[in-house]
A protein has these predicted regions:
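Bacterial N-terminal signal peptides that target proteins for export
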Residues: 1-7
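Charge-biased low-complexity segments
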Residues: 21-44, 48-62, 66-81, 86-127, ...
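…; additionally, a secondary subgroup of soluble metalloenzymes is captured
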Residues: 10
Length: 650
């Protein structure tokens, strides 16, 4: 960071008291850390000093602004924004000695707002910083920062700001990398404004300023070449686009960019402001802990503030250590992905219900629960810390169970760690004499049925898991017993083992303890209907469906997920240019499965690299066939089904 710090030699009004001298010394020490860019030390020192000052005075304002700047550098934008907002509100505007604090504070606030997906607030902060800039380079920084955010919220406004920045830079900047960054921002503004030919020209200039299409690739080269590839793709020049992607090293990983543990797109609808036809390219980086360090939009088919919802979704993704290890450091630092919002309805699963019941039982036992942030890697790190602390404090086995449960069910944890945690939490829980449903959940975990990736589609229930049906405590509880029966039947149905699934389903239907309209009985009847249909017995399928009492819409949410009967992918689906340039990748889709096993409404929601494998994947799943389900009017057999397809050059 360029030093533009003006020392404030006396934080407080002159005083003879020893306390005042102590505060001044503390301020000087914090300032030394701040000036030396030791951000953690500076943030801690200013935080301690803030508590000793009057809340709304000049001194407190200076401390809060500088603490906020330090926090922003530490990647703690929420805390930074809070401190900066308070500090800037009380910072005297007419005090010339604080001019740099005003500028630096506004710039830091803009970056914090940008990082927390508040684009309009970020733009406002950058625009307020621009007239406060102490020199031409600082003004250039403010203009280009505002333009960078405006590229995806208001491309026309971004062009005005970046053109002013380029005019200011003309003849004054010899740094080609900085000049390339300015042309990249201008290119993105044109790209988001659908001026693809002009965008290509601008982005091509940025690439040339960085040395052209060489085999040397750094983060800056990666961004510029990727932008150029996107512009070429949107302009319809696929051959050139694939070449640029190859030089950006996008898709050159053997198996494509390793997918995260929970790569969910944002929902479409009023809550996000996103429409099904919206598409965005999001740039993000992954930290050493497997969490997303930053995420920001690069391109939006419909520019506006709502596009940050794509970036917000990406910020919640996580990578398990074994997956993260497959991603080279360059791509962990920065990669791009194509995204669309999800129209899939929330489909309840038995495992989600079991997990919720286990957590509720822990809470009812007055046990401290593991933190739930929604980010798998963050929750995993917190559970590990809490578990270590409680082991050191000789906590009881059951007190450790909630944290072990979090690790066992966290997709960012390595398989071996999940297995060990599952065995430990289940044993502790079983020893606490839990109610039948919790006993079943613990038994499943102990059997290895859900603790690791070994419980996968098509594997069927393990022998140990099936023995839970004979546990007297479970057998005596109607709901727990029949929940397990349907769960195990579904695992058989996934591999079309109808003969193994049918006895379990018939047992649910025959259980006289269930009411005729009970959801478990209805779910079993729907599954029997599908098995009868697969066996060619249409009258039996119709009768079972009618006995379920469910509508077609209810059925689509409660039925077992259909299994693939014919996967239609082949070499003909691999884009020719991608083969020529050895580009690998993948795409994730969602669609409905009709009662006859065909698909409809196939959409690519996430794809890597952008605009390469999304449409080929859509075509594959448009041809793929699934098991048939009985629906009287031929409606949807399964709504919001999700599937992915990988592409690999051998």
């Amino acid at each position: 960071m360029k030093k533009r710090f003006i020392m404030v030699t006396a934080l407080l009004v002159a005083s003879a008291s020893a306390e005042a001298a102590t505060v001044q010394e503390a301020f000087d020490a914090a300032t030394a850390a701040y000036d030396g860019e030791r951000w953690a030390d500076a943030a801690a020192a200013f935080d301690a000093l803030e508590a000793r000052l009057a809340p709304h005075g000049r001194s407190a304002a200076i401390v809060r602004v500088r603490k906020g700047i330090a926090l922003a550098h530490l990647g703690r934008p929420d805390e930074a924004a809070l401190s900066l907002t308070k500090g800037l509100a009380d910072l005297p505007a007419a005090d010339a000695t604080l001019a740099i604090d005003h500028y630096d504070g506004k710039m830091a606030l803009g970056r914090a707002d940008e990082a927390t997906f508040q684009p309009l607030a970020a733009i406002a902060a950058f625009e307020q910083a621009e007239p406060l800039a102490p020199d031409a380079l600082s003004r250039l920084e403010a203009l280009s920062s505002a333009a960078r955010v405006e590229t995806y919220t208001d491309p026309a406004k971004a062009l005005v700001a970046i053109d002013e920045a380029l005019s200011l830079a003309q003849g004054k900047i010899s740094d080609k990398k900085l000049e390339a960054q300015l042309h990249t921002i201008r290119g993105r503004a044109l790209l988001n404004g659908s001026q693809f030919a002009a965008a290509r020209k601008e982005l091509d200039r940025a690439v040339d300023l960085l040395g052209g299409l060489t085999l040397k690739v750094g983060v800056t080269d990666l961004a510029a070449r990727s932008d150029l590839a996107i512009a070429a793709l949107l302009a319809g020049d696929n051959a050139a686009a694939k070449k640029y992607l190859a030089y950006a090293a996008s898709g050159t990983l053997e198996d494509g960019f390793a997918r995260g543990a929970n790569m969910d797109p944002p929902d479409c609808g009023a809550a996000t402001g996103l429409r099904p036809d919206d598409v965005a390219v999001i740039e993000f980086g992954i930290g050493a802990d497997g969490t997303v360090a930053y995420a920001a939009p690069v391109y939006a088919s419909r520019p506006g503030p709502a596009v940050v919802e794509f970036a917000r979704a990406a910020a919640g993704w996580s990578w398990a250590p074994d997956r993260l290890a497959k991603i080279p450091s360059l791509f962990r630092a920065m990669t791009r992905i194509e995204m669309r919002c999800s129209e899939a309805p929330t489909r309840p699963t038995m495992q989600n219900s079991l997990d919720a019941e286990v957590r509720s039982w822990f809470a009812a036992q007055h046990l401290t629960l593991a933190a739930q942030s929604g980010v798998a890697a963050t929750d995993l790190a917190a559970a590990r810390r809490d578990l270590t602390a409680r082991r050191a404090g000789a906590a009881s086995a059951i007190a450790l169970a909630p944290f072990l449960f979090e690790i066992a069910t966290n997709r960012a944890a390595p398989d071996a760690e999940r297995r060990a945690a599952a065995g430990e939490w289940s044993l502790a829980t079983l020893q606490a004499n839990p109610p039948p449903m919790i006993r079943a959940a613990a038994g499943l975990a102990a059997s290895g049925a859900v603790a690791t990736s070994s419980w996968r589609k098509g594997s069927g229930p393990s022998v140990t898991a099936l023995k839970l049906l004979d546990d007297p405590a479970i057998a005596d509880d109607t709901r727990t017993l029949n929940t397990l029966r349907i769960r195990f039947a579904d695992q058989y149905l996934e591999r079309r083992a109808y003969a193994l699934a049918m006895p379990l389903i018939e047992a649910v239907i025959a259980d006289s303890r269930l009411a005729s309209a009970d959801q478990l009985r209805s779910a079993a009847l729907v599954r029997r209907s599908a098995i009868d249909l697969a066996g060619g017995n249409l009258p039996a399928a119709r009768a079972a469906f009618e006995q379920s009492g469910l509508s077609e819409a209810q059925c689509a949410l409660t039925d077992a997920q259909p299994a693939v009967t014919r996967h239609a992918g082949g070499t003909q689906d691999y884009p020719v240019e991608a083969i020529q340039w050895h580009i690998s990748g993948w795409a994730m889709t969602e669609f409905d499965i009709n009662a006859d096993g065909t698909t409809s409404g196939v959409r690519a929601t996430i794809a890597y690299p952008p605009f390469v494998f999304g449409q080929p994947t859509v075509k594959i799943f448009q041809r793929t066939k699934y098991t048939q389900t009985y629906r009287p009017a031929g409606g949807s057999g399964c709504s919001g089904f999700k599937a992915s397809q990988g592409f690999r050059v051998l």
